[in-house]
UniProtKB/Swiss-Prot annotation:
Thiamine diphosphate binds at residues 65, 113-115, 155, 184, 260, 437. It catalyses: D-sedoheptulose 7-phosphate + D-glyceraldehyde 3-phosphate = aldehydo-D-ribose 5-phosphate + D-xylulose 5-phosphate. Mg(2+) binds at residues 154, 184, 186. Belongs to the transketolase family. This is Transketolase 2. The lineage of its organism: Bacteria, Pseudomonadati, Pseudomonadota, Gammaproteobacteria, Vibrionales. Its cofactor is Mg(2+); Ca(2+); Mn(2+); Co(2+).
Length: 664
């Protein structure tokens, strides 16, 4: 079978899919078809009949706009992606959305489209592979042994996140990571030399990568030799620089930006079919080409061989094998619920007035002993975020058995790498930075929410309570923006008990990211009944109450809860009927049934004050237009925290004053 014709099947399906949708990007799939054919048919270990086989190679299309490439590959290889699915490219509720989306079609390892994040996810997958191998492989038993392959274009390399990720990949010596640069010299605006003239091979050599330059991306033998050389280099990641022609096969549009992001048109597709010698109708693939592409039997054989290896491992190391299966399945330890409930009860029984960032570290200490799957990290702020605990061990190029990654000052890279670790499986990953600097990482957290993957972020120094560092470091609008992100769970605890509950729920939440927001300054622990402790998980609960119906409700989060309690005590002493609601997680509260929400915030009680050292406007949903909000309406200032809280109205006196005005 002629390899060019096998690659032309990808080109034809890509042209046809984009044309039928009247939307899409045919250029990259047509340009990378030869590379994809060699990789997928001669090297990629995968099983179309079990896309979740734990030791499969991972393939990431970082230049996700070229999605017809991966859809064509999955269809031709025998995954459950039909020709009708390809005909439904970019249509509502299809398995083939405009950019590849995790969870839609089997075999899609990650959602890509925002350029640079796919290569970064791939770095995370390669870290996970290296760490799992170091933790579980034994002499003569390599049960974790797979490659991560990634296709990326000029756009990925222009994005700053590619520097963050590829720099760290070199430092960590990710020898099982192999990236293909689609060096076609074209972007949306035209020829890239006017805005992208880097010496990319030297750039990657400087990162510590193994670089294979100047590979003809349309020569199957050259591509194959490059992949063999890349696989043989086990101590460094490899960049294969493939020179390609965008839109290869299109006689009048190849090599130009005209074929990047628009259908070729019926006349040009007809001309391309003639140029390529492709004599078949749109979406028609002859049986001999299907047969040559079909990977089902080979994939099943590869997985069966691995099953035999794993059976031998399980016989020699039964405890490790059981633990590996538990972790890859994403199951928590059997004693999890009992142990964590006891930890939380003990915290309530032994009050401590500590910063919630310290409470977070204590939770890591307690829960970490139960979770060998923890994979922590921080963007060069471990002593401030307090993300290391006594069991933390640094993961390095020389020893990947560690459970803590020093990400350096790479917030965006860290967050997207964690997405890759989560997608790979076998770990409960978390990262950390100051809340203000989640701004650098926002799109990766959005991607975690979109993909519904577990990415736990610890965001400390959560308000003007940061003090002297000033408004560049003081978050204002960040908490609200996290809360408004669909499928994100955001927690701002008020003491060590709420902090531990937030951590417990984040660890249990496998289908979404969590943002855990902690203070720099010490916070008073609140007394609670067992019922109140249980209600923390509901996101909002009655912390202090009056006899009968309240005339005023104070709603507060985090460091402002003790302020609400102090105001409650003063107002109660003056005979006012006041309730305090602690609301560490608005999204968790919003998910409760109507009866519970009414019990906490009765509709009849319209006099409400929300108190939070974050943007004020967020709270109208809970206080109504008749309520009041003590919050931020501007950026902060540089001064000691106590002075700032006073300046911006976060004092008992101001809360009491506002309450009395509302009750008057």
């Amino acid at each position: 079978m002629n390899r060019k014709q096998l690659a032309n099947a990808i080109r034809a399906l890509s042209m046809d899919g984009v044309q039928k949708a009247n939307s899409g990007h045919p250029g990259a799939p047509m340009g990378m078809a030869d590379i994809a054919e060699v990789l997928w048919r001669s090297h990629l270990n995968h099983n179309p009949q079990n896309p979740n086989w734990a030791d499969r190679d991972r393939f990431v299309l970082s230049n996700g706009h070229g999605s017809m490439l991966i859809y064509s590959l999955l269809h031709l290889s025998g995954y459950e992606l039909s020709i009708d699915d390809l005909k439904n490219f970019r249509q509502l509720h299809s398995k083939t959305p405009g950019h590849p989306e995790y969870g839609y079609a089997p075999g899609i390892e990650t959602t890509t489209g925002p350029l640079g994040q796919g290569i970064t996810n791939a770095v995370g997958m390669a870290i996970a592979e290296k760490a799992l191998a170091a933790q579980f492989n034994k002499p003569g038993h390599d049960i974790v042994d797979h490659f991560t392959y990634v296709f990326m274009g000029d756009g990925c390399l222009m994005e700053g996140i590619s520097h963050e990720a590829c720099s760290l990949a070199g430092t960590l010596g990710l020898g099982k990571l192999i990236a293909f640069w689609d060096d076609n010299g074209i972007s949306i605006d035209g020829h890239v030399e006017g805005w992208f003239s880097d010496d990319t091979p030297k750039r990657f050599e400087a990162y510590g990568w193994h670089v294979i330059p100047a590979v003809d991306g349309h020569d199957a033998d050259a591509i194959n030799a490059a992949i063999e050389a890349a696989k043989a280099e086990t101590s460094r990641p490899t960049l294969i620089c493939t020179k390609t022609i965008i839109g290869f096969g299109s006689p009048n549009k190849a090599g130009s930006h005209d074929c990047h992001g628009a259908p070729l048109g019926n006349d040009e597709i007809k001309a391309a079919r003639e140029f390529l010698g492709w004599e078949y109708a749109p979406f028609e693939i002859p049986t001999d080409i299907y047969a040559a592409w079909d990977a089902k039997q080979a994939g099943a054989s590869k997985e069966a061989a691995w099953d035999e290896k794993f059976a031998a491992y399980a016989k020699a190391y039964p405890a490790e094998a059981a633990e590996y299966k538990r972790r890859v399945a994403g199951e928590l330890p059997a004693n999890w619920e009992a142990a964590t409930s006891e930890i939380i009860a003990n915290l309530q029984a032994n009050p401590a007035n500590i910063a919630s960032r310290k409470a977070s570290q204590n939770a890591l200490e307690a829960f970490g002993k139960l979770l060998p799957e923890f994979m922590g990290g921080s963007a060069d702020l471990a002593p401030s975020n307090l993300t290391m605990w006594s069991g933390s061990k640094s993961l390095t190029a020389e020893d990947a058995s560690g459970n803590y990654i020093h990400y350096g000052v790479r917030e965006f890279g860290m967050t997207a790498i964690i997405n890759g670790i989560a997608l790979h499986g076998g770990f409960v990953p978390y990262g950390a930075t100051f809340l203000m600097f989640m701004e650098y990482a926002r799109n990766a957290m959005r991607m975690a929410a979109l993909m519904k993957v577990q990415n736990i972020q610890v965001y400390t120094h959560d308000s003007i309570g940061l003090g002297e560092d000033g408004p560049t470091h003081q978050p204002v609008e960040q908490i609200a923006s996290l809360r408004m992100t669909p499928n994100m769970s955001t927690w701002r605890p008020c003491d060590q008990v709420e902090s531990a509950v937030a951590w417990k729920l984040a660890i249990e939440r496998k289908d979404a990211p969590s943002a855990l927001i902690f203070s720099r300054q010490n916070l008073a622990q609140q007394p609670r009944s067992a019922e109140q402790v249980a209600n923390i998980a509901k996101g909002g609960y009655i912390l202090k109450d009056c006899a009968g119906q309240p005339e005023l409700i104070l709603i507060a989060t985090g460091s402002e809860v003790e302020l609400a309690v102090a105001a409650y005590e003063q107002l109660s002493a003056e005979g006012k009927a006041v309730r305090v609601v602690s609301m560490p997680s608005t999204d968790a509260f919003d998910k409760q049934d109507a009866a519970y929400r009414e019990a906490v915030l009765p509709a009849a009680v319209t006099k409400r004050i929300a108190i939070e050292a974050g943007i004020a406007d967020f709270w109208y949903k809970y206080v109504g237009f008749g309520g009041r909000i003590i919050g931020m309406t501007s950026f902060g200032e540089s001064a000691p925290a106590g002075e700032l809280f006073k300046l911006f109205g976060f004092t008992t006196e101001n809360v009491v004053k506002q309450a009395k005005e509302l009750l008057a």
